[in-house]
Amino acid sequence: MVYSQVLKGAEYMNIADQLEQHAHQELQHALTISRQIDYLGKMPSVTPKPVKVSEKARDTLRFDLDNENETIVNYQERIRQCEALGEFAMAEQIREILVQEQDHQIDLATALGEDVPDVSRLRGARKR
């Protein structure tokens, strides 16, 4: 939600609206994951990552894209873990979230005039 409120300038109005939609979707993702954690008999707890912001709209979009890339890698790993545990329905719910996260990634890369990042390199770096 923070990113959608700090972007200024006509060229960023479309992405600012999209970022506000992303924020609402992110809340739904958190609720879905919390329900799944509760289903597993655990207590959901979250320590949010600090939000990086900048006076420069382009930098703000870059920070958000970097966060989306990391989130995608994390969800891909959660899907593999769920499947390894035989929690196939849970993996499917996370896949649905992943589709939206990839849409967010596309929106941000497009706003930056870039190709969608290849997060497989991030995943490989985390395994080392």
Where are these regions (language model features)?
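Iron-associated oxidoreductase/ferritin-like identity signal
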Residues: 1-128
